[in-house]
């Protein structure tokens, strides 16, 4: 699943390529990819004649602000969640569409924004301008702070973790704790901290949380600078891969030697998700 660095990379690409261009129409090729409005006809009618004036990211959600060419003021928001296999691709109209194209926006000048999704878990919303986002995209209201936000601090982490017995890896995946962190970067953060993924959350000290906070920000920054990770379906808006995969320390490297000590990287199941770690660099400690 695309995580914060991948979604942020897509957001920056959309801000670079799609702004101030009029949407000439839209197609919904798979009805269930459209979460709101329910009617495809309403979606097509409402989005035609609008232009995108800016994109932002919240957790793993994308939100594009729409303005109408016919009336002043906000016209609404275009929302998207890529889920497991979603892609947003900016491409010329005469290029062949991928097989799993689900929603298409037609722009003036012969360009299209295509929502491509193999497994069909991703969603697109057209949000009214006069309603709070979270009323329609209910998942937004459940998100914790952004990793780079002022309210995400080591002290906040410590208060949230100190009374929980959940494995630390599982806690970091909880979007209510911190928005946007997922399986790839939780593994990487724990490696850089030297913490075993099964370590109980209530075993961390405030000093540990300072390290976790630091490594979350550092790891996500490095991944954003690399354009994200392309292990499977993720692509940037121009269709190219992200480059962080070759920099990964543990994720996706089970059976390979640790880049720091040479110990074979291990993989376990933890709460229905995989966890990759170095048994030497991340020993399981009894505290």
UniProtKB/Swiss-Prot annotation:
GO BP terms in the entry: base-excision repair
PROSITE patterns: FPG_CAT, ZF_FPG_1, ZF_FPG_2
Family in the record: Belongs to the FPG family.
Zinc finger (FPG-type): 249-283
Subunit annotation: Monomer.
Role summary: Involved in base excision repair of DNA damaged by oxidation or by mutagenic agents. Acts as a DNA glycosylase that recognizes and removes damaged bases. Has a preference for oxidized purines, such as 7,8-dihydro-8-oxoguanine (8-oxoG). Has AP (apurinic/apyrimidinic) lyase activity and introduces nicks in the DNA strand. Cleaves the DNA backbone by beta-delta elimination to generate a single-strand break at the site of the removed base with both 3'- and 5'-phosphates.
Name of the featured protein: Formamidopyrimidine-DNA glycosylase
Keywords of the record: DNA damage, DNA repair, DNA-binding, Glycosidase, Hydrolase, Lyase, Metal-binding, Multifunctional enzyme, Zinc, Zinc-finger
Organism of derivation: Synechocystis sp. (strain ATCC 27184 / PCC 6803 / Kazusa)
SUPFAM superfamilies documented for this protein: Glucocorticoid receptor-like (DNA-binding domain), N-terminal domain of MutM-like DNA repair proteins, S13-like H2TH domain
Cofactor note: Binds 1 zinc ion per subunit.
């Amino acid at each position: 699943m695309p995580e914060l660095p991948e979604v942020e990379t897509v957001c920056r690409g959309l801000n670079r390529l799609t702004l101030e261009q009029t949407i000439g129409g839209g197609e919904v090729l798979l009805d269930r990819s459209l979460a709101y409005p329910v009617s495809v006809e309403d979606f097509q009618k409402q989005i035609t004649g609008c232009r995108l004036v800016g994109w932002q990211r919240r957790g793993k959600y994308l939100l594009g602000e729409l303005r109408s060419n016919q009336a002043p003021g906000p016209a609404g928001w275009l929302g998207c969640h890529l889920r497991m296999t979603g892609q947003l691709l900016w491409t010329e109209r005469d290029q062949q569409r991928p097989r799993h194209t689900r929603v298409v926006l037609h722009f003036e000048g012969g360009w299209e924004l295509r929502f491509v999704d193999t497994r069909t878990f991703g969603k697109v919303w057209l949000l009214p301008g006069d309603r709070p986002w979270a009323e329609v995209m209910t998942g937004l209201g459940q998100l914790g702070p952004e990793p780079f936000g002022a309210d995400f601090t080591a002290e906040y982490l410590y208060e949230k973790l100190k009374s929980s017995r959940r494995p630390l890896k599982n806690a970091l995946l909880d979007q209510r704790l911190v928005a946007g962190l997922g399986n790839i970067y939780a593994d990487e953060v724990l490696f850089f901290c030297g913490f075993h993924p099964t370590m109980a959350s209530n075993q961390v000290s405030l000093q540990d949380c300072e390290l976790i906070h630091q490594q979350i920000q550092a790891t996500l920054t490095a991944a954003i600078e690399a354009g994200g990770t392309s292990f499977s379906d993720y692509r940037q808006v121009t269709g190219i891969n992200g480059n962080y995969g070759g920099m990964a320390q543990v994720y996706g490297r089970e059976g390979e030697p640790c880049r720091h000590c040479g110990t074979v990287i291990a993989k376990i199941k933890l709460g229905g998700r995989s966890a990759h770690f170095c048994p030497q660099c991340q020993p399981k400690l009894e505290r």
